[in-house]
Amino acid sequence: MSTSGTGKMTRAQRRAAARRNRWTARVQPVIVEPLAAGQGKAIKAIAGYSISKWEASSDAITAKATNAMSITLPHELSSEKNKELKVGRVLLWLGLLPSVAGRIKACVAEKQAQAEAAFQVALAVADSSKEVVAAMYTDAFRGATLGDLLNLQIYLYASEAVPAKAVVVHLEVEHVRPTFDDFFTPVYR
């Protein structure tokens, strides 16, 4: 005698699960700047959240050394009220110019006295030699605020010397939608 809820899936459920896995299996090994049309896969923000995107070009990176880049908030989010907004998911991805050779790694970690130690404590690493050029932090920053992101740095490592502005670091942060003031200040006569 069979019992209900034994975990058996219907044919439609099995096909849907297989389709989901097929979508997530596509990974871009290296994202070449400028972005080609249709490259990557868009992920929607959770209801009530919005996504802020900003990018920074790296300075010249010396070979076999770890360099640090600070995170600066976009101008519209730098007010004290917006620094209190809760953060959801964070996406870090590397854009490499076609002229870049060798291995490039990037990670987000708290500010370190020794930059070399950042990759040991990093939450995830974006690596151009492996197929993880984008690092998605789904739960690591949940509950943090946008102001807390200012205590973070992006660390870059290159196996060969890289000129300035050859690596573009893109950071996308999902956060609670800011409440902008939609009304003009009342004018009293």
From Swiss-Prot:
SUPFAM superfamilies: Positive stranded ssRNA viruses (SSF88633)
Basic residues: bias regions: 11-21
Name of the protein in question: Capsid protein
A single Gene Ontology CC term: ribonucleoprotein complex
Family classification: Belongs to the bromovirus capsid protein family.
GO-annotated molecular function: RNA binding; structural molecule activity
Stretches the record annotates as Disordered: 1-21
Protein species of origin: Brome mosaic virus
Keyword Coiled coil: no
